[in-house]
Structures are given as C-alpha cells and as structure tokens.
C-alpha cells in the first residue's frame, strides 16, 4: 500500500528498506522480491519499546494539543528555531524511545512549547536517520517511508536531506 500511494510500485520488483512509523509501530523492514514474486519482508530494526507516534502524541498531550498530535505538533514545531534534538543510542538499527520521552519531558519544563515540539520531532528524526544509516551499511537500496509520523514535514525533510532522492 505504501509503494502504491508513493507511486513507487517499481520498488516491489527489487529490494528496498521500508519504515512504518506510526502510533502503533515503528519498524524498519528489508523488503525484496521473493522467488514467488511476492514481497519477502524481514524486520531489521525499529523501536524496542515506545512507537514514534506514541512519543509524539505524549509530547502533544503535554502541550495540550489534540489527539492524535502529530499534525499539530509539526505545525507548532515549524514556527520554532532549528533544534538539534536528543541523539539516541542506536544499535543494530534498534533504539529505545522511552529515554527520549524523558528528554522531551525535561525539555517541556525549560523551553517554549514550539521549541519542545521541535525537539521531539528532531529527536525522532535523529533515531530514524541513525537506524537507516546503519541499515544502509548492509543494504544499499532505496527507502520507502509510511505511517502517520512520516507526514511530519520536519522528519521527511531531514530524511530527504540525508538520503536525497533515495527516500519515497
């Protein structure tokens, strides 16, 4: 479905990395065309606890934003100054977001709402980019992104800046 909505059905004939980032899951898959012509998917990374969308919804809740909070959080964050975000530990394409949640909650105590929103989104982007970089050490193929979290202009821009035309 993600390949269809991105207009990238041609990816199904080869090999690619696929992120599904939402409130329910945050998984990085390696996908290749199987011998039977159907996609063969292997989960190679993602979160070990909290889904990316859960983290963003919790940040939005702290700010009093409507649920789900992704769109409103992104709009607020776009009004903020650029922010580096928290640099998570990523190992074998896997990372924990619960520690990032603590960082976001600490930022809430000390920063303006728009800066806290930006911090949360940049933190998720940092984790996703680092995991993707690790995956690309083994799999040199295009990247397909799906799920509500990838609707974020900030996260998508960061992915496109880092991986260029390789991201759909």
Protein language model regions, located:
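Buried hydrophobic packing segments
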Residues: 1-4, 59, 132, 159
């Amino acid at each position: 479905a993600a390949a269809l909505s991105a207009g990238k059905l041609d990816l199904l004939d080869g090999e690619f990395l696929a992120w599904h980032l939402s409130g329910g899951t945050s998984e990085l898959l390696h996908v290749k065309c199987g011998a039977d012509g159907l996609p063969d998917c292997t989960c190679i990374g993602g979160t070990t606890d909290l889904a990316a969308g859960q983290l963003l919804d919790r940040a939005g809740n702290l700010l009093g934003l409507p649920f789900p909070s992704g769109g409103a959080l992104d709009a607020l964050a776009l009004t903020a100054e650029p922010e580096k975000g928290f640099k998570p530990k990523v190992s074998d394409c896997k990372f924990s977001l619960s520690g990032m949640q603590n960082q976001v909650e600490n930022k809430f105590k000390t920063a303006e709402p728009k800066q806290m929103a930006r911090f949360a989104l940049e933190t998720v982007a940092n984790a996703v980019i680092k995991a993707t970089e690790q995956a690309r050490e083994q799999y040199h193929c295009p990247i397909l992104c799906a799920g509500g979290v990838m609707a974020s202009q900030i996260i998508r821009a960061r992915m496109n800046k880092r991986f260029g035309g390789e991201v759909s």
